[in-house]
Each structure stands twice: as C-alpha cells, then as structure tokens.
C-alpha cells in the first residue's frame, strides 16, 4: 500500500485546478507517473491493488484500472499475474533519480550559447502586444474590409478544397508570387518575376535569412545610423558586426562606404523612408551604392517597408529596380499595408539566390499557410489591395497633417515636427 504521503500527492493532483480538464483516470495516471519520475516510487516498489486504491481515492475500480493500463503501456509499471503491479526496472534511469553521492543540481538560469545570450541581452523586436499611444509604424486595422476578405477566403476553399489545408511550396504559392511580382513591378519599378519571389512570414524573417545565408559570423555589414533596431538585432544575432553609416536629409551618406569599400560585404538600406527619420535616399546616392556593390561584389539588402504610404508626389523607384547587376535583395511586407496578423512578407531575389534562400527558409518554418496566401493573391489580383492602400494613404496623410499641426501648436518651442514624405512615423526635433 502507498505511504500516506504518496496517497496525498495523488489526491492533490486529482483536485488541482490545473488538471481539472483531464479525465479522472488520466489525472491518476499522471500523478503516479510523476511520483515514479521524481524517485518517490523506486523500481520494484509495489503499487496498491486497483480495488484498494479506488477505495482510498473515492473513485471506481475501472478508473484506477484504466490509469494502470496506461502506465503499463508507457512502460512505467509491470503487471504480474498473481503479484499485482510494480514499478518497472527501466525507470531506474528516470530524470528525477540521483545516484549515490550524486550532487543535487541547484536551480537557476539555463546555460545558453553565446549567440543565445546575445539575443536575450538584446531583447526581442516586439515586446508590446498592445501598441502604446503614438507608437510609430502601427497600422490602422479597424477599416480593413473583413467581409471582402471572408468572401475571397470562401472562394479559395470552394475551389481548392482540402488542398488549401495541406503543406505548400516553401517558395510560396505561385498565384501570390505572381501577384506580388506584378504589384512591385508596377508600383515600385522593380525587376520581378514570380520565380524570383520568395514568400515569408515577415521582413524580420527576411533580414535573418539575409544575415545567415549571405554572410558568415564575424563578418561586417554597413547599416544606417540611426538604423531600424530589428535589422540590427537580426544581424547581431547572426554574429555580424554592424558598421554604422550616418544619415542626413538625403538619406544614407555613401562617402564612408566609398572611402572603405572593402570594409563590409553587405549594406542594409531603408531608401524609401529611412527609419526613423523618414528621409528618402536621393537617386544620385542610390546609383553610387549600386556601383559600389557591383565593384566589390557586395550585397544591398533593401528593406522597402511601408513604401505604399507616400504622401508627396511619386516615390522614387526602388533600388532593386535600378540595379542591373543583380546585387540587390528587395524586402517587402503586408504587415503595415494590410494587417500584422496576416504574417506575410516577401523578398525579390537575384536568380542565383532563389534556391539557397528557399532551402534556408524551409529549414526555419517550412512555408506560409496556403489558405492565407491564396486569399491574399485574390485580394491583390481583384484590385482590392490597391483600393485599400489608396484609401489608407489618404487616411494616414490626414492624420499626419493633424498630428503635425497639433504638435506645432501645443508643443511649439519644445518639439519641432519633421513631416516625412511617407511612412507611418513622424520624427521631431
């Protein structure tokens, strides 16, 4: 028979709120299993007869029998005809047991790799699930046409059936890759075809892939100063050394790069709207950086985040579209243009990088959900995306003007608003 303390442990598990959703026999089975793993029940120790334990716990004998049967199937106990149930010999190696004289480990922080320690020390990219007031880069989601999205999703399910629920192409669903290529060619002047598009979950994933596939730990990469913190964190997590390059009213200054052209093998840019200042990289500087990348066989990582929201005139063509040398990787996302919960971003890649990048992403998370990809493809192809972006561009432009006016009026002398040409942030001086 159990010692009274062991019986009380089983009873406590039966009554604990954490386990109330489990069937009664599962609670008994897990309680006894934990006693074995903790070493409270040693190999060869007999278990009480099912009838006796049932009476002690106030449950039916069938319930205890079901618990014992599960423990036997898992290998925790042995059932012997005529001699009852005993703890199996194999549990001698269970994690909770200590050999004679073995020191007891004191709890504490787990030992991490240097890379893991660096990532933990640097913190995550998003720690606030609910955005704080005036937080930059947060899209408005209350105006999204949910009814249209739901209708398109039903169409996808009707056409594809269960195929929309299975594993998909690691490179991304072909209809979405084609829709993305058509869009960036038209709106951003890119050089894109469907077979050069890699669908991802976010721009953050794209930055991480660039860091790990293009460069080795210990190598250096040029970054804007100030830079988007998510990019810097992705590069540092991959073991890269970030070399800051100053930014002025025309964007990143190329002179420090051209003065030391071999100092780094890659450059990360936000040329459309630099984060956080919002300035746009001039055409002259774009061309100079493209030539630098060609001469040094370096890579340009172009993060074209929220380029859809340009409030003054036509935006300059993306760097990737100007680069005839195929040294630029273009990153885009639907996080800000649609909604963050969609979790779809993409890269437009040089042909030689499509295969290695696709393999690398498949090792991370396989692929994006097919249903969301196919629904988004219809949303874009049907003209809904363009219409929605135009409406949101007007809304954000109005809000930007209102905020700038109120800041100037209420905080004049303390803060000078710097109204950017585009984007979802407004810096101040």
Residue ranges of predicted features:
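N-terminal basic, amphipathic alpha-helical segments
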Residues: 1-156, 352, 358, 362-369, ...
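Domain-scale detector for complete catalytic domains at protein termini or as standalone homologs
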Residues: 48, 235, 257, 328, ...
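Active-site PLP attachment segment
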Residues: 322-356, 368-371
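Conserved functional loop/turn residues at catalytic and ligand-binding sites
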Residues: 40, 75, 239, 304, ...
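Short glycine-rich anion-binding loops that position phosphate/pyrophosphate groups of nucleotides
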Residues: 139, 271-275, 336
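Conserved core of the PLP fold type I
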Residues: 153-297, 308-325, 329, 396
